[in-house]
Amino acid sequence: MNLIQSLEQEQIKKELPSFRPGDTIKVNYKVIEGNRERIQAFEGVVIRRRGGGLSETFTVRRISYGVGVERTFPLHAPKIDSIEVVRRGKVRRARLYYLRALRGKKARIKELSTR
């Protein structure tokens, strides 16, 4: 293992839940306002995961007041406090960009049934 890979291994978070595109997750991340820091939640559907190792990112989409909002988070960022899987979704694609064009009930994703 070379030097860069060993440094990346030290920075990678270990306690992350497993989630895939189609899952609804809640990301609690730290926001700095002035001189104080608070935790803000962002809940939505994962529409993509990309990269690997320390530079892996994921994009979460939600509808806020009728407007679609997408936010891309680095998976191992220190600003992310926690990630919680709300529900598992059943999709057959790795990139769910088609959700951008859908509105209302058509934008819903089937829930993955667990036995």
UniProtKB/Swiss-Prot annotation:
Q: Spell out the GO cellular component terms annotated for this protein, sorted alphabetically and separated by semicolons.
A: cytosolic large ribosomal subunit
Entry keyword annotation includes Ribosomal protein: yes
Physiological role: This protein is located at the 30S-50S ribosomal subunit interface and may play a role in the structure and function of the aminoacyl-tRNA binding site.
Q: GO: which molecular function terms?
A: structural constituent of ribosome
Q: Which NCBIfam families match?
A: rplS_bact
The record's family statement is: Belongs to the bacterial ribosomal protein bL19 family.
- What's the domain of life for this entry? Bacteria
| One GO-annotated biological process of the protein | translation
Coiled-coil residue spans: none
What keywords appear on the UniProt entry? Ribonucleoprotein, Ribosomal protein
Protein name according to UniProt:
Large ribosomal subunit protein bL19
Q: Which InterPro entries match?
A: Ribosomal_bL19, Ribosomal_bL19_CS, Ribosomal_bL19_sf, Translation_prot_SH3-like_sf
